[in-house]
Structures are given as structure tokens and as C-alpha cells.
């Protein structure tokens, strides 16, 4: 029986193979081959046309006496490790917690140049934290859409903080932060901060922060509301306006405008308060339209070598550029509009030099001659005019 069953099994094997071969086409029809491979990340290169060397900012920085580390995804909290007798300055109300010996910690409220910073709309209330033993502090902001970035200052490169509320915390005995007045921007953006020395900085921006590295000879165009900070080794950023499609309409000149301007009616009308109010209203409407409708064409141009920190969310155009700067950029031809700014500065310089020249001419015109008095024997006094007038 065993031999018989073995022979039956061997005889059924070809049938089983053929049966499996019959089912294999249906199974092959249901199968899909998936090929998975790792993609190579794009390498940042030149900024002029080919690549954009933009990357995320550093999430940690260290010095011999302190260490800054950004935690969270997206970055939402800052961890600060301080050594003994090291000072930490953080904005008032941003300290979340602290670990270490609490009895050795000293916290005081510091007023950093309140007069100048208040005029420039820069925060001046900071909390100074120091300890005789090593501590670790956690710092955060009240806003839910801000992220952190840390900058290590080694003394070779100085930074300019473009946003007045971007500076959150810093440490370093030789670090110096000076408020700077930028009259080219609007009143809400007059205050910039120049940072020099050695130490660590903690900056905050709206949305996500990115770093753009420029080499020598490279250029980068950025919206002024998105710039958080930049190095000041390179030339100052210049206003820039993109080209647009314009359909010029040429109307033959008939001399009507010149005739109307020469008439007495137009001259008397231009001196009235109603005419001046109408011109002022037209100027306001034109500036508003340039900011609102054509505001996306107003940018800033940076020249390398430079490092620029930009934020993904920006403020309004009205909070960044003044009325005068918007009109100067809009009236200038497309491209680099530094010529318009230079002409405005030269005009202002000429107005200042003309009064000085007039003052210098006053002493020379006042002294036009010399009078000599002689007393006669009878007691009368005679005056004789001599000098230039003779």
C-alpha cells in the first residue's frame, strides 16, 4: 500500500504543477512591482539664476560660557545653559522655567537705554539672570506663530537686526547692542539694532526662519517686510523695483497745458486752499494705490558677501516703507532705484548748503568801507569815508 500511495502521489505532481501554472496568470495580473529608492537632496548653489542657497537656520550655538539650543518642531522654545557668573538677558515675560539651585539665582529687571529705545519703538525692558552655579533656563514667546533662530557672534562679523522685536535674548560680556535710527523706513520701522562683539543671540521671526548665504558678486532680492537680520559687512541694501508691462499712449502736444498754466485764472486757483487740499488728497490716493496695488514690486537688493535671515510671514508694506520712499521707488525706472534716493539726498544737501553760503557772504557784504574821524581845533568832528567805496 505504501508503494502504491507513493506512486499515486508522484503521478499527481505534474497535474499539481500544471494547476499552479493555470492560476499563475491571474495572480501575476494582480501583482504590481514597486521600486523604492532614496532621492538625492538638491545642493544649494549660486543665487544668480541656477540655485537659491536658502536653508533652515541653526538650531544650536555654543560659547565657552553658554549654550543656546532650540527645541520643538517647529522651533517653539529655547533652552539656555549658563555657566557660573554668566549673565543672560531675556525679554520681560519670556522666561518659562529654570533648573538648578534656585537659591543661587539672581533675577533683576534691567532698563536698557529706555529713552532712545522708546523713541525707536524697540523693547527696553529685559530680565537679567545670573547665578553662582550652572543653570538651564527655558525661554519662549507669547505668540503661537513665531520660531527661533540662534546666531553665534565671534567678533569678526557684525549684524544688523531689521525688525525691532526680533531680538529675544542674548549673552556675552563683550556683546554690545546699540539702537540705530533708520530714517529711510517708516515710523514703525525706524528702530534697528546693531550687534557687535562676541556672544550668542536668540532671534524670533513670524512664521519660519531661513538663512540665505551670498558669496562675493552674488545678488539677492527680498521683500523688506521679510528681512529679519543681515550682516553689515556687505554694502547696505538698496531699493529695487521689478519691471512691468506698460502700454505707452502718445498724444500729440497741442500746447493746451502751457496755455492753461500761463492764465491768471489757473495761477489764482493754485493759490487757494481748495486746490491745495485737492492736491493733497490726490497725493494720498496715489500713494495708497502704489502701496496696495503695486506694492509687491517694491523689494530690497542685497549684494554679497552677506548672510540674510528671512521670515516666511511678513508685515504690511505700510509698516516698512515710508510715503516718500514708496513714491521715489515708483517714480524711478525699473531696476536698481538707488539713483532716485541719491538725487533726493543730493537735493537735501543742496538746500542745507545754500543757507550756509548766504551766512558766509553776510560779513563780507556788511564791511564795505572804512570811516576815519578827525577832530578839528574848533571842536567839530569830521568823518572821512575810505576803503572799497572810495
Curated annotation (Swiss-Prot):
Localization (cell): Mitochondrion
Location of the region described as Disordered in the Swiss-Prot/TrEMBL record: 348-373
Family, similarity comment: Belongs to the AIM24 family.
One GO term of the biological process aspect: inner mitochondrial membrane organization
Protein name: Altered inheritance of mitochondria protein 24, mitochondrial
Gene Ontology CC terms: mitochondrial inner membrane
Matches recorded under InterPro entries: AIM24 (IPR002838), AIM24_sf (IPR036983), Trp_RNA-bd_attenuator-like_dom (IPR016031)
Keywords, comma-separated and alphabetical: Mitochondrion, Transit peptide
Transit peptide (residue range): 1-28
Primary location class: mitochondrion
Pfam family name, one: AIM24
Residue spans of biased composition, Basic and acidic residues class: 348-362
Gene name per UniProt: aim24
Amino acid at each position: 500500500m505504501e508503494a502504491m500511495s507513493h506512486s499515486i502521489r508522484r503521478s499527481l505532481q505534474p497535474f499539481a504543477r500544471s494547476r499552479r501554472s493555470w492560476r499563475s496568470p491571474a495572480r501575476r495580473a494582480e501583482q504590481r512591482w514597486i521600486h523604492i529608492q532614496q532621492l538625492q537632496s538638491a545642493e544649494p548653489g549660486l543665487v544668480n539664476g541656477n540655485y537659491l542657497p536658502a536653508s533652515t537656520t541653526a538650531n544650536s550655538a555654543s560659547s565657552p560660557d553658554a549654550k543656546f539650543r532650540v527645541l520643538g518642531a517647529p522651533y517653539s522654545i529655547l533652552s539656555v545653559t549658563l555657566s557660573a557668573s554668566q549673565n543672560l538677558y531675556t525679554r520681560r515675560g519670556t522666561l518659562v522655567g529654570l533648573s538648578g539651585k534656585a537659591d543661587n539665582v539672581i533675577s533683576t529687571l534691567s532698563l536698557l537705554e529706555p529713552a532712545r529705545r522708546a523713541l525707536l519703538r524697540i523693547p527696553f525692558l529685559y530680565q537679567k539672570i545670573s547665578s553662582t552655579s550652572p543653570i538651564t533656563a527655558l525661554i519662549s514667546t507669547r505668540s503661537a506663530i513665531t520660531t527661533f533662530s540662534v546666531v553665534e557672534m565671534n567678533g569678526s562679523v557684525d549684524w544688523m537686526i531689521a525688525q525691532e522685536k526680533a531680538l529675544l535674548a542674548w549673552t556675552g560680556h563683550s556683546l554690545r547692542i546699540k539702537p540705530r535710527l533708520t530714517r529711510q523706513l517708516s515710523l514703525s520701522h525706524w528702530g534697528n539694532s546693531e550687534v557687535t562683539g562676541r556672544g550668542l543671540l536668540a532671534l524670533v521671526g513670524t512664521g519660519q526662519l531661513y538663512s540665505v548665504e551670498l558669496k562675493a558678486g552674488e545678488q539677492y532680492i527680498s521683500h523688506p517686510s521679510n528681512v529679519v537680520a543681515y550682516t553689515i559687512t556687505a554694502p547696505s541694501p538698496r531699493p529695487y523695483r521689478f519691471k512691468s508691462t506698460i502700454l505707452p499712449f502718445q498724444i500729440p502736444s497741442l500746447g493746451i497745458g502751457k496755455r492753461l498754466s500761463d492764465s491768471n485764472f489757473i495761477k489764482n486757483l493754485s493759490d487757494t486752499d481748495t486746490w491745495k487740499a485737492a492736491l493733497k488728497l490726490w497725493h494720498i490716493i496715489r500713494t495708497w494705490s502704489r502701496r496696495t496695488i503695486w506694492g509687491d514690486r517694491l523689494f530690497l537688493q542685497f549684494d554679497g558677501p552677506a548672510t540674510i535671515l528671512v521670515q516666511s510671514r511678513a508685515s504690511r508694506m505700510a509698516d516698512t516703507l515710508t510715503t516718500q520712499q514708496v513714491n521715489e521707488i515708483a517714480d524711478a525706472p525699473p531696476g536698481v532705484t538707488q539713483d532716485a534716493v541719491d538725487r533726493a539726498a543730493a537735493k537735501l544737501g543742496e538746500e542745507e548748503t545754500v543757507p550756509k553760503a548766504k551766512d558766509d557772504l553776510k560779513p563780507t557784504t556788511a564791511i564795505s568801507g572804512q570811516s576815519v574821524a578827525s577832530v578839528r581845533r574848533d571842536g567839530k568832528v569830521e568823518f572821512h569815508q575810505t576803503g572799497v567805496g572810495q
